[in-house]
Amino acid sequence: MAEKFRVGITRDILDSRGEPAFGPAALSILADAPGLEWEYLPAVVRELTPEHAARYDAVYVNMARTPATAVARADCRLRVVARHGVGYDSVDVPAMTRAGIVVTNTPMAMPRPVATIALTFILALAGKLALKDRLTRTGRWDERMDNMGMGLTGRTLGVVGAGRIGKELLRMARVFDLKLIAADPYVNAVELSYIGARKVDLDTLMRESDFVVTIPLFNDETRHLISTAQFALMKPTAFFINVSRGPVVDERALIAALQAGRIAGAALDVFEQEPVDPANPLLAMDNVIVTPHALCWTDECFHNMASTGLKSIVDAASGRRPEFVVNADVLTHPRVLSWLAR
């Protein structure tokens, strides 16, 4: 009898009741697959180990890191690392490719949810939502006249990174009659013009925008893409929003810009250090909105991510190429060809 294809799911995707945060429906994708068995990892882990790679053919990973050391041993049976999300900076992709391990992600599940949270931040900053909530709760009703918001009509939204998520945000923002600009060296001007946006360089975007939203893919090229020089270009009335990855922004430079009043405020769903240090100065600023890298986490978003991610595992178990392969070069690796050719 053939050995079953074994799948491990990291426990950091469970809620406080021990139930999958993406709901039960997506698990049927695994339960209904012939020749496959699955389990949650025995404990919450910050990174996968050689023992995990020796036990499982595929691992569905939320936040745990997948380093090169995890797949360095000769007894590694791991074939697939499936990320619950679009980002894969937590996975040593070159090491996985060398080891003949397919890395997948869930890009199509993310554009609308992440674009929605960026738009949520824009509206909250423009209307001074957090401040007015505090005024109401602390009996400062009479201070309303001193806290006017910013109207959106004719204002400029600048999007740094015009991939799937950036384009979705630009499309959604058109209803507010904003001027739309975007900076992305890998997207052409004609493509952006189809959605009503103008392509500009990063410096121009920082100077012209009333709202700057960063949504680039995080890699070595985009680490600290936004730093002191970029914040110095912004209008003092402009707002900064980051919904990509914390290290895209030089956090010290952002703190300095806010403390000096060089920009009007910020909204962040991500931080350079996560979980964020409770002593981080950003948490004490009244003009900064913060959320715990989870604002786009909705039942719909998590179900769609899990459905896509778990299907990629079932595809691999069945000898099929998963739909969203991050490291396409691995598909010619002899180890991958051995199971794709079955």
State where each predicted segment sits.
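Phosphate-binding beta-alpha-beta segment of Rossmann-like dinucleotide-binding domains, i.e.
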Residues: A99, P107-T156, R171, V175, ...
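Rossmann-fold NAD(P) dinucleotide-binding segment
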Residues: R65-L78, E221-F239
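Short glycine-/small-residue-rich Rossmann-like dinucleotide-binding loops
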Residues: A64, V86, P216-F218, S244-R245
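N-terminal glycine-/charge-rich "phosphate-binding" loop or analogous flexible N-terminal tail
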Residues: M1-A58, H333-P334, S338-R342
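Rossmann-like dinucleotide/phosphate-binding beta-alpha-beta segment
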Residues: R144-P236
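Short beta->alpha connector loops at strand-helix junctions that form conserved
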Residues: H84-G85, I101-R112, D184, D203, ...
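Rossmann-like dinucleotide-binding domain for NAD(H)/NADP(H)
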Residues: T237-F239, V243-R342
